[in-house]
Amino acid sequence: MNDDGKVNASSEGYFILVGFSNWPHLEVVIFVVVLIFYLMTLIGNLFIIILSYLDSHLHTPMYFFLSNLSFLDLCYTTSSIPQLLVNLWGPEKTISYAGCMIQLYFVLALGTTECVLLVVMSYDRYAAVCRPLHYTVLMHPRFCHLLAVASWVSGFTNSALHSSFTFWVPLCGHRQVDHFFCEVPALLRLSCVDTHVNELTLMITSSIFVLIPLILILTSYGAIVRAVLRMQSTTGLQKVFGTCGAHLMAVSLFFIPAMCIYLQPPSGNSQDQGKFIALFYTVVTPSLNPLIYTLRNKVVRGAVKRLMGWE
């Protein structure tokens, strides 16, 4: 503890993740639900990664980016869900200071990367529908790899900024994080000093990595809709709307909860409401992405048949 009463969490060695302790009667139910969705996430996303690697028909930009998204979702959920399951299962709800730093860094990094990657995926669909004759030039494999690397680098760079700013803030007295994982708004609530600079930085970068990507995605799909409406083929219309509709659903399931959490000051959030919103985009959305992208996809169904030897 400092002379002025402020606590450096590293000297204490741990944080207490309050999580859903206020509803002990719900913890078993939440544990079962979270475990089911986590297993769905692991199975569904591993399935997409393996299938995209094994089937040559899926060696296209769309499935390259989808494999990146699947790997991203695997990492994103694994950065917080195992800790949540441990806390829900038993009375021990602590996380080490180093563990909290690592978790905060990866949750932020992977979440930001997903925002950028979804923009890249929308651009790929725009190029495929609106610029079909130039698609192979626009989405050259080398350029696709560059876009994927840029997505990951931007996410991890942004996270380094926020993580360092957050853990420089001195804490006051207690170490109870009113959340189920280490997150910037929840950690800023522990501070006894003015955190307006941190909150402003969070809102600015959230606008850059949430609002701007969302605008770019909606612009891409707006152009796609206009191009599709000019098509004469009913089959083409159904195929394009089916693919783009699935992408937009995945975008909505990720961006809407993220905006509710990060585009307002930590003091403006209902803490309990924030937990359930975060539970949705860290548990539910990653498990639904494989279903959304592949459920009605004839190319994926064909790849499965070839892999199983049914064709």
From Swiss-Prot:
Main subcellular localisation: membrane
GO molecular function term, any single one: olfactory receptor activity
Matches recorded under CDD domains: 7tmA_OR2B-like
Topology Extracellular: residue spans: 1-28, 83-103, 162-198, 263-275
Keyword tags: Cell membrane, Disulfide bond, G-protein coupled receptor, Glycoprotein, Membrane, Olfaction, Receptor, Sensory transduction, Transducer, Transmembrane, Transmembrane helix
The keyword Membrane is annotated on this UniProt entry: yes
Record's GO cellular component terms: plasma membrane
Localization per record: Cell membrane
Stretches of the chain found on the membrane's Cytoplasmic side: 53-60, 124-142, 223-239, 296-311
Membrane topology (UniProt): Multi-pass membrane protein
InterPro entries, sorted: GPCR_Rhodpsn, GPCR_Rhodpsn_7TM, Olfact_rcpt
Disulfide bonds: 100-192
A Pfam family hit: 7tm_4
BP-aspect Gene Ontology terms: detection of chemical stimulus involved in sensory perception of smell
PROSITE patterns in alphabetical order: G_PROTEIN_RECEP_F1_1, G_PROTEIN_RECEP_F1_2
Residues carrying a glycan: 8
Transmembrane segments: 29-52, 61-82, 104-123, 143-161, 199-222, 240-262, 276-295
PANTHER family cross-referenced by the UniProt entry: OLFACTORY RECEPTOR
Family: Belongs to the G-protein coupled receptor 1 family.
Entry function: Odorant receptor involved in the detection of the flavor compound cis-3-hexen-1-ol (C3HEX), a compound typically described as 'green grassy' or the smell of 'cut grass'.
Descriptive protein name: Olfactory receptor 2J3
Originating species: Homo sapiens
